[in-house]
Amino acid sequence: MTTGEPSTRRTRRRVARVVLVASVVAALVAVAVVVAPLLLPPGPRPAFQLPVACGETWRLSTYPGHDDYDVDLFPTEGEAWGRPVLASYAGEVTVAGINGSLGARTPDNPKGPRGRGGGYWVKIDHGGKWETQYLHLLEPPLVRVGQRVARGEQIGRVGSTGNSGAPHLHYEQRRGWQKVETYFDGQPSGITEDDREYAVRLTSDNCAPR
């Protein structure tokens, strides 16, 4: 007389093996989906424009200890506080929030306590492993994570939140998540190493499509 128990145990073991194999395959596929894009080379450089209003001239500067390729932007005329900050190129917002702590520097209290890090900031993914970052914004960004933005769309206003000594826009371009020299209107900015204090002047061509 047979009870069927050995057969049942074998069936259960086979089912368990099938489930285990399926789980391993699913995990490998998930890893491949995540890792494969990371192995691709960066795409061509987008046609970045200055992240400020069309026709305005701004001073781009750096200083010792600032970090290579980081750019601080100051207007050459008028007040910096509250100036529109524009997307350098179309893309998707991946960060819109606070980096570090805000501090208390405002237009009404420009010498208030400094914060830490970048304060209010925005990061935009432009595809092809290219991204831009915009730091020390005056107030919460005007965009949200996941939002698609067009080149020239306003994403915030110039401020002095975070570790900032004066109102300005700290700006970066990254390729493959590594900082690179900023390009605007197809030309290198000239801001490279932070071995000394220096600046250049550029006029924005971040204008409405003609």
Residue ranges and their predicted role:
Residues 1-18:
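Terminal targeting segments of Actinobacterial cell-envelope proteins
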Residues 17-27:
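Sec-dependent N-terminal signal peptides
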Residues 30-47:
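C-terminal region of N-terminal signal peptides and the immediate post-cleavage residues
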Residues 44-49, 79, 111-114, 144-153, ...:
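Acidic, glycine-rich catalytic/binding loops that coordinate metals and/or anionic ligands
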Residues 60, 91-93, 146-158:
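A structural signal for short beta-strand/turn segments enriched in small hydrophobics and glycine
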Residues 78, 86, 126-152, 176:
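Short histidine-centered loop motifs in beta-beta connectors
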Residues 87-139, 167:
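Zn2+-dependent peptidoglycan hydrolase active-site motif and core
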Residues 142-144, 154, 160-167:
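Short glycine/proline-centered loop/turn elements that form peptide/ligand docking sites
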